[in-house]
Amino acid sequence: MRPSGRKTDQMRKVSFERNFSKHAEGSCLVKFGDTHVLVTASLEEKTPPWLRNSGKGWVTAEYGMLPRSTNERMKREAASGKQGGRTQEIQRLIGRSLRAVVDLQALGERQISIDCDVIQADGGTRTASITGAWIALHDCLKWMETRNMIKVEKVLKDHIAAISCGIFAKQPVIDLDYLEDSSAETDANFVITGSGGIVEVQGTAEGAPFSEEEFLTLLGLAKAGCSELVALQKQAIA
């Protein structure tokens, strides 16, 4: 039995609140159960130096957690003067995931910066960030389209969503919360497009290795979960 009482293939309640920030071109408050992340998408009329005069744009991401988003207060990374390895890994993952479904040539020489700030953490912050970031990115591109800068359908090639899966109490489960994540025998994150393409898989065994059969079971859970998340994204932007 899962601590939350959920079935092995049951995700937490997921919601998207669009236009949460009045300043950003695109924004979304995404909730995966008790994990809440505020995502903003900001348009900048510039590109990284290595892309100048290439005709291509860029999508990048930053990720952070509020000090009291967790059980005990964490120090702000800014106070220590540097980002931790986990933060850098997650924000690169978010950026890679979004770029996988963006035509950078069609975006033109512009940069969209995605900021993911975890307000409350209960497991799955990176997967919630990616899934909510797609909404914020979509709305930023819609803002651009209303100003005749781009056509959304030419820039945004597909949906992208992410979900965690793992083996908890010897059972393959989807969308792990903190209690499950902290004691799971296997923990994996999957990033999958709306058309079923796999963008990234991160999998780690804690203690004993997991089998190919177990991995394929987790992949099956993830594909079903991401399909459900994409359906919720479509519903949110309708």
UniProtKB/Swiss-Prot annotation:
NCBIfam families: RNasePH (TIGR01966). The gene is rph. It comes from Agrobacterium fabrum (strain C58 / ATCC 33970) (Agrobacterium tumefaciens (strain C58)). Phosphorolytic 3'-5' exoribonuclease that plays an important role in tRNA 3'-end maturation. Removes nucleotide residues following the 3'-CCA terminus of tRNAs; can also add nucleotides to the ends of RNA molecules by using nucleoside diphosphates as substrates, but this may not be physiologically important. Probably plays a role in initiation of 16S rRNA degradation (leading to ribosome degradation) during starvation. Its EC number is 2.7.7.56. It holds the Pfam family RNase_PH. Phosphate binds at R86, G124, T125, R126. Homohexameric ring arranged as a trimer of dimers. InterPro entries: ExoRNase_PH_dom1, ExoRNase_PH_dom2, ExoRNase_PH_dom2_sf, PNPase/RNase_PH_dom_sf, Ribosomal_Su5_D2-typ_SF, RNase_PH, RNase_PH_bac-type, RNase_PH_CS. It catalyses: tRNA(n+1) + phosphate = tRNA(n) + a ribonucleoside 5'-diphosphate. GO terms for biological process: rRNA catabolic process; rRNA processing; tRNA processing. It is an enzyme of class 2 (transferase). This is Ribonuclease PH. It comes from the Bacteria. Belongs to the RNase PH family. GO terms for molecular function: 3'-5'-RNA exonuclease activity; tRNA binding; tRNA nucleotidyltransferase activity. Keywords: Nucleotidyltransferase, RNA-binding, rRNA processing, Transferase, tRNA processing, tRNA-binding.
